[in-house]
């Protein structure tokens, strides 16, 4: 069974969706570790409740980001992880780390990339008068919220919507599409070849597939 590592910083709601997808067998893999860069991350409690080992790596314990990422990478190599899943990991990965695990790191971002990389995506979409928003699962490279896009899910923005309403709508889609993409990877259906995403041997379009 393939081994999955999940990196978190906060509540771990996407982590919970992935845990449940593994427990039901929807994802035919095993989460072997949950890593957090925040000691008070509630996601660590979710891991504990599911019987999943966890580790905390704090920036203050290392002389540089490079050293921290090297330590995390060495740990992941020691336990022979097949896939690294970023689930609300609010620390930018260093270039050596993304190169070391190229094609083995997935991230989910709360926008329809390439629109709205970075933070405050719901607020920015609302302020710009967008009629839709969404979420994107993509491979990770050294570019922030870059990397080949795999799958996107759209949500409507209605007149009078608040940021919180858009976020709730988007998160519900995240819990659907992230386990699905992880499933594809674990089943060897999804691959990154020369910085492009392929599913079942077919090159995905630049914005990935649209989840319906």
Set out the residue ranges of the language-model regions:
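Short, basic/aromatic-enriched C-terminal tail that caps enzymatic domains
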Residues: 16, 195-212
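Short beta->alpha connector loops at strand-helix junctions that form conserved
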Residues: 55-60, 108
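N-terminal Rossmann-like dinucleotide-binding module
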Residues: 1-42
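Short, structured coil segments at secondary-structure junctions
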Residues: 50-51, 101
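Conserved acidic residues
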Residues: 32, 82, 103
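Donor/substrate-binding cores of folate-linked one-carbon enzymes
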Residues: 21, 87-200
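N-terminal glycine-rich "phosphate-gripper" loop used for MgATP/nucleotide binding
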Residues: 36-37, 65-66, 79-95
